[in-house]
């Protein structure tokens, strides 16, 4: 029953197109905004937490992160945060820019889009180790982003 309800998510001013990812605390959906721009929408469900306190703590964290998300080049820009209006299955959501497409970093095809990740880069390398310089660059950018979050009391 929960998966049927979850497939009918309503995000204001967005047409939810398809699920593109997920993890322990939520699902990521592709959606089209009223301007036509494709976005990623992370939906975090209350039922995925042991208690209300943990759910609300995570919501407070994203509220704190949203205004600073645009202040550092290593962070994903949060464009909007909101709460779902389903009292039986409470959730909150946040709208983000889509990450690079594994097939093309410029044009997003809503049917074929697949997020580019370190895993997809490793798979594309077909067993050839990733360039050391690339790995150092990624590691440095991650460390700088994490340091910034620590400075803002978010990590």
Residue spans of the language-model regions?
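AlphaC helix of the eukaryotic protein kinase fold
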Residues: 45-69
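AlphaC helix of the protein kinase catalytic domain
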Residues: 104-130
């Amino acid at each position: 029953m929960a998966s049927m309800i979850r497939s009918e998510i309503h995000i204001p001013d967005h047409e939810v197109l398809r699920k593109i990812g997920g993890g322990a605390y939520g699902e990521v959906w592709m959606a089209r905004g009223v301007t036509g721009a494709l976005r990623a929408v992370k939906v975090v469900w209350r039922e995925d937490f042991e208690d209300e306190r943990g759910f609300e703590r995570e919501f407070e964290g994203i509220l704190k992160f949203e205004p600073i998300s645009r202040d550092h080049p290593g962070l994903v820009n949060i464009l909007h945060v909101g709460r779902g209006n389903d009292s039986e299955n409470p959730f909150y959501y946040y709208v983000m820019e889509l990450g690079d497409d594994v097939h093309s970093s410029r044009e997003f095809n809503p049917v074929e889009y697949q997020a580019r990740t370190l895993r997809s880069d490793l798979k594309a390398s077909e067993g050839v180790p990733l360039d050391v310089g690339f790995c150092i660059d990624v590691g440095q950018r991650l460390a700088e982003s994490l340091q910034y979050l620590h400075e803002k009391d978010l990590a």
